[in-house]
Amino acid sequence: MGAAEEEAAAAWDKAEAKEERIMVSVRLRPLNGREAGDSCDWECISPTTVMFRSTVPERAMFPTAYTYDRVFGPDSSTRQVYEEGAKEVALSVVSGINSSIFAYGQTSSGKTYTMTGITEYSVLDIYDYIEKHPEREFILRFSAIEIYNEAVRDLLSHDTTPLRLLDDPEKGTTVEKLTEETLRDKDHLRNLLAVCEAQRQIGETALNETSSRSHQILRLTIESSTRQYLGRGNSSTLVACVNFVDLAGSERASQTASAGVRLKEGSHINRSLLTLGKVVRQLSKGRNGHIPYRDSKLTRILQSSLGGNARTAIICTMSPARSHIEQSRNTLLFATCAKEVVTNAQVNVVMSDKALVKHLQRELERLQSEIKFPAPASCTTHAEALREKDAQIKKLEKQLKELMEERDTVKSQLDCLLKSDCDDHSDGRVAKRWDEHSRSSESFARNASEEAFSVSDTSGVPYQDQDNAVFNGSYVFSDDRDDIVFPVQTVDLPEETKHEKFMSPWHPPSHHSSSDCIESYHMTEAASRTASEVSEEHCREVQCIDIHEHRRSTSHKFDLLLPQDTEFQTPELEISKEAVPQPDEDQELESITNRMEDPTRMCPVEEEQQDEIVDTCESNGTTDNDVKLYTCDSNISFDIQKPYPNGCLTVKRCILSSKDRALSRSKSCRASFMIIPNSWFDDSEYTSQTPPNEILKHTPRRFDKVRRSLYPENDNPSSVDRSEFSGEVSSDEVVKDMSTIDEVAKDMCPSDAEQETLTSDISCLTKLKKTDSDHEDELDEYQDQQSIRDGSTTLRTVKDVGIDSSLSASPSRWPIDFEKMRQEIIQLWHECNAPIVHRTYFFLLFKGDPADNIYMEVEHRRLSFIRRSFSASPAGGELNSAVVSSLKNLRRERDMLYKQMLKKLTNGEKERVYARWGIDLSSKQRRLQLSRLVWTQTDMEHIRESASLVAKLIELLEPAQALKEMFGLNFTLAPRSERRSFGLLGT
């Protein structure tokens, strides 16, 4: 027995309450004989929804559709009502859980008819369960009472003396001297039910011939225990009871034509039902306030069933007749409140005295240990919680300050490095020449594979070997599979500088099997001084080199690594197979050799396709040099890098590649165009002070100033269809633009050093072999996407190259776009029921600064998503839960503003505000009217007035930058350590 007692004590410890809501069902009875001429105004439109069919008045405050756990129509049987609305709750009693089943409704709505059937079906199922579990011993006890005119009577006794109610600390409210019969079998129970039916008070009214004049409560108590010890799970004794409550119906004296005794009975019935409604309504709101259980004997007896230790099911019966519409609405209102009530049902375990003693001993030991070794005190008061939150806020502020300091430090370091580069290169002169062209193509390709930019087949990341590529004087794009190289630029440096390595602060080293690679082209001061001794040479032009590629099987992209702090990338360059003819390989190699010997000589492809591709620029002596722009089937993009501080303009190399040798396209470069460079600008005015592209690549800070110098506010680059445009831009205009950039650059970084000639860029057109059909599809898909996104290729002059469309646009466009987006956001606030305080903060914080673009965009997208979620209404016509929640929160905010007006505004201020908002000073509830008016319209004057008023009521200080950063913390972009890209910084 000791083990059994321990098991019982353990079961006592583990008997935990389970929270659940009251199960509410609605049964709609058919029209009776008295209602034959009346219309039916209620209809069950779904298994869970009942709807009012007639027209609802315009100012009606009640809904037209009601949703519950289950709704039964006039054709539903009592058996169906029991199976779907009460069976699960009724059978909980055999598992040791208390349960109660109510029937609630107006008089003559079918409550007694429903409860009689449910009681019979429950008894049959309980006895069926007992027969299927012979391993447990069941003891059933039955009692019955009625509450007639607030007097408790025993239905199993012929004595009509009212019984007293007693409060027991363990059992709760009990009825003194109540008869409790131990049942022998189900026939015995049926006989007792018949006795109760005969003893109950009934009477005749105008609405019902057999109207119940009292509340009836039938209680069936079941005690079960194991016949022998079968293990831990079946050793305890369980005791639970089920209550079948048939409430008397609410009635109106005018409808029932009651008088005398019937009138007195009706008044007591209505009073007890009113108390029941108060209790249910208070429980539906929570257990914070006082719950008037003791105002009625009915609620006092059923206290445990209403929000206590029991599972509860309520069946609300109603008449569909129009004459009872008001009583039907009251019934549905009661059901709506009841489904929000939460109960805490738990298994009732009975323990022996020894088991109870052991349980109490363990509990005593636990309490003593807590006293001796108290646990660390948690935040139990509001003050402690506030202190903890303040500490967290200070910690976050400290982290934010450290991050801002770190950002400023890095920014200053970058500025110093850029300034150092300006000083280093002010006296340096680097001449450009081509490498030895006498070597064969095969030898050239083999050497270039070790010295050039290359693309790894496994990683797809280009890199540069500084030891070989830079200091041996070649910049070559190479493909490991084809051994085909593109000579791009050659730089000669003295021998003593060829083996020095320089590490860029922006680029981490990439590793290759042959040597360490870095991605910076910056020279140190020592290298610059040595380079200044190199003789100066003028730049020469090398025309198109067409190279035929073989064995091309997969597409390949050159992705240039850019600094982490800039979003500009080398644009994707493509040319279709139709743009360039395909000569034999021998002719191509011969063409390469000839062009390397004589840079001014045209390749055969240029001669044949002169109209489609490029017009050869005239010789160096030509005075009227032109820069010609053409369109072809490919899209070629350029970047104008940031001007060098000494005042130089560099045009990025123009490289045409096939669809399988495409450079990755920057998202910021939306315009694709092609420029054919002129003959070498022999004039020192044109060629002097041109730094390497790679240096300019890392100086993006002065883009905005350069853009403003290139484009006036009213200047908008034109877009011309690429299939129809063929025009020329004179070199004078280009030189004028270059001079403008030179002046801007000199203003930004003045230098007294002599302007030296550096490298100019070359252009080369690459003819590529036709690939397989898969690659053709890839090119077609890309071109289709380009056509859809751009509509037509935008052709710009050299000054437009590489500048993002958002930057190159006129600065005057931002205020217009800002006002348009702000108006859309205000409209979305109105549609999405956005919080008023949030609207006020946002409206006052973001007033049109260009840096606010990201916050405006994120807010617009967030509200658009909320609006889409609002539009997805659930089945049954019920309002979206998100919409209901947002409306509730909005109403709470308005109530808060209503209260704040009393605290924050003086009487004079109130009168001025009322006059400004058009509220009559003689009207009532002026503060309530004002709180309902703010943020209800979308015109800008109303918005400004609303934001100003709310800011004053909530004591919103003048917006500062720190506040804006905290407000937009969720939208801040921060770099990720593992990639050179941006990601969202979550909070």
Swiss-Prot record:
Keywords: ATP-binding, Coiled coil, Microtubule, Motor protein, Nucleotide-binding. One of its GO terms (molecular function) is microtubule motor activity. One of its GO terms (biological process) is microtubule-based movement. ATP binds at G105, Q106, T107, S108, S109, G110, K111, T112. Residues 21-341 form the Kinesin motor domain. Residues 350-420 form a coiled coil. It comes from the Eukaryota. Residues 709-733 are annotated as: Disordered. Belongs to the TRAFAC class myosin-kinesin ATPase superfamily. Kinesin family. KIN-7 subfamily. This is Kinesin-like protein KIN-7H. It comes from Oryza sativa subsp. japonica (Rice).
